[in-house]
């Protein structure tokens, strides 16, 4: 499969890129800073681009699917506005390119922890970032989409670089916790879940979440 990975040098995007390559897919890494791509692979093409300035449809045209790990950063400027603009550009560009399949790296903040209560609602104001709010808005945008075969994957409350076990539990809109009350997943196993969904779609036009 030929996959365009937007944000392929990021905290999560880099693992999605590597997992896709390990499975034998052809990957186009669409990044702002090509020098950050240190992996070398004959099936990897690196393209320098700015999602807010370049035409997304031209960047992704000819691929079988788009995986967006786009992020506007954690600080500096209006992160919320920039992230939402980028997400909208990716959604519209994917549609314009004729590609149907779009998978999006989401956040945990929009997961339900109780009826009518999302994880982000339980956080103190100083912990809530523009990026968290923007990923929630991205989900709202996707849920209005009728044309794309989109999937939005929310991680557990805690996601860290650890190990690839190849195992995870799957949920829908509710935060998953283990017997100890912990909600966590490694970046590696998050990438496994993303590629599993791409190869064997189970959540078309849905959000799902993964955790141990």
Predicted feature locations:
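N-terminal Rossmann NAD(P)H-binding glycine-rich loop of SDR-like oxidoreductase domains
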Residues: 3-23
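Glycine/proline-rich active-site loop of Rossmann-fold NAD(P)-dependent oxidoreductases
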Residues: 145-146, 160-167, 197-206
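Conserved beta-loop-beta element that borders a ligand/cofactor-binding pocket
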Residues: 140-161
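Conserved catalytic-site region of short-chain dehydrogenase/reductase
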Residues: 75, 109-114, 158-162
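NAD(P)H-binding glycine-rich loop region in Rossmannoid oxidoreductase-like domains
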Residues: 35-96, 202
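Substrate-positioning beta->alpha
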Residues: 134, 181-195, 206
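Conserved beta-strand positions in the Rossmann-like core of class I SAM-dependent methyltransferases
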Residues: 4, 28, 151
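Conserved Rossmann-fold NAD(P)-dependent oxidoreductase catalytic core, especially the SDR/UDP-sugar
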Residues: 26-28, 34, 88-132, 144
């Amino acid at each position: 499969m030929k996959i365009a990975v937007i944000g392929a040098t990021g905290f999560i995007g880099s693992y999605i890129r590597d997992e896709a390559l390990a499975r034998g897919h052809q990957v186009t890494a669409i990044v702002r800073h090509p020098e950050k791509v240190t992996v070398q692979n004959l099936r990897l093409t690196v393209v320098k681009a700015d999602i807010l300035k370049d035409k997304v449809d031209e960047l992704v045209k000819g691929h079988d699917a788009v995986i967006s790990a786009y992020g506007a950063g954690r600080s500096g400027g209006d992160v919320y506005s920039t992230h939402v603009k980028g997400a909208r550009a990716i959604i519209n560009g994917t549609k314009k390119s004729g590609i149907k399949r779009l998978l999006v790296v989401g956040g945990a903040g929009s997961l339900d922890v109780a009826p009518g209560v999302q994880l982000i609602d339980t956080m103190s104001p100083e912990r809530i970032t523009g990026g968290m709010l923007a990923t929630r808005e991205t989900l709202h945008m996707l849920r209005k989409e009728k044309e794309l075969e989109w999937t939005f994957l929310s991680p557990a409350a805690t996601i860290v670089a650890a190990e690839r076990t190849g195992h995870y539990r799957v949920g829908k809109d509710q935060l998953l916790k283990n017997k100890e009350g912990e909600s966590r997943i490694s970046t590696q196993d998050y990438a496994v879940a993303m590629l599993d969904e791409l190869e064997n779609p189970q959540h078309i036009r849905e959000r799902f979440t993964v955790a141990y």
